[in-house]
Amino acid sequence: MFSSLLEAAKSSPFHGPLTPARCDAPAQGMAASAAPVGDSCEFGSTKYFALCGLGGILSCGITHTAVVPLDLVKCRLQVDADKYKNVVNGFRVSVREEGLRGLAKGWAPTFIGYSLQGLCKFGLYEVFKVQYNNMLDEETAYTYRTFVYLAASASAEFFADIALSPLEAAKVRIQTMPGVRQHTARRVAQDGPERGAWARSTRALVPLWGRQIPYTMMKFACFEKTVELLYKHVVPKPRAECSKGEQLVVTFAAGYIAGVFCAIVSHPADTVVSKLNQDKTATVGSIVGKLGFAGVWKGLGPRIIMIGTLTALQWFIYDAVKVWLRMPRPPPAEMPESMRKRLEAEGKL
């Protein structure tokens, strides 16, 4: 894996002129198929999906934990704008009151919660994408591929947020409420669904869906389409001729572009979730009414930086894990030959 990262750091396919490039022809159908020589598993097999889940654990758990200090300041900006004026001021006040160690508050529930979320988000996305594609014929699957990405990612995130919600609530309380300690997350996990701490922590599940499902739909659909467009219009050679490192650079670039859009579409719901987890008596309506239109966008700047970087790194790590484990990595979608011939005969291509 680390050799892949080093190779990517030294590679960049964007040095040439802007010329169209051919994409590799996709495999016919999305069902599990025999593993080509060199691959560690069959595409669409149980092992393939399990390894995708492992990649999700690493990509989400590591990256979200790495940006805990920025996330802490972002949450405090959202819940106490009078005290924390901006990002720089938020860091200064936090360090002055709690020291540098205070910037790591909430790291444990962040790591556990987002690792579980990553397992479901990436693993189930691959499962649902294959299943939904198999429900369609080849031409329909290609024509409506963006809708397949949207449906698969929304389905995966629905389950991922059920795993994340209790630990996300614990994280926000640790970061924004004085006196709340790290063991809050452990207590939530030990209580289980039937106990009060768990029930209170899941009250923000619906707003969390409101934040994360649009975020994830944008994250996956925008990434898939951006990769497709980069190889078609920007990268000066076909994907098959790119080294693994160059392919990972394209992955990182597409991930960052997707991350910017993710942050924008999900930010109002993110603000509401932070407020709900801070104040157990608040409702979605009361929070939106109190904050107003401008208030729900508070903290968007640092969140764009955080989510853009996070999303790029997550896709990079996820793809690097696939390279490291020698997993099948299908190329971007290309028009089926039957569809191409039909459109050419009709003079539409």
Swiss-Prot record:
Its main location: mitochondrion. Solcar repeats lie at residues 47-131, 144-229, 246-324. It comes from the Eukaryota. GO terms for biological process: mitochondrial phosphate ion transmembrane transport. This is Phosphate carrier protein, mitochondrial. Disulfide bonds: none annotated. Gene3D superfamilies: Mitochondrial carrier domain (1.50.40.10). GO terms for cellular component: mitochondrial inner membrane. InterPro entries: Mitochondrial_sb/sol_carrier, Mt_carrier_dom_sf, SLC25A3/Pic2/Mir1-like. It is a multi-pass membrane protein. One of its GO terms (molecular function) is phosphate transmembrane transporter activity. Belongs to the mitochondrial carrier (TC 2.A.29) family. The keyword Transferase does not apply. Transport of phosphate groups from the cytosol to the mitochondrial matrix. The keyword Transport applies. It is found in: Mitochondrion inner membrane. The chain crosses the membrane at residues 48-68, 108-128, 147-167, 207-227, 248-268, 304-324. It comes from Choristoneura fumiferana. Keywords: Membrane, Mitochondrion, Mitochondrion inner membrane, Repeat, Transit peptide, Transmembrane, Transmembrane helix, Transport.
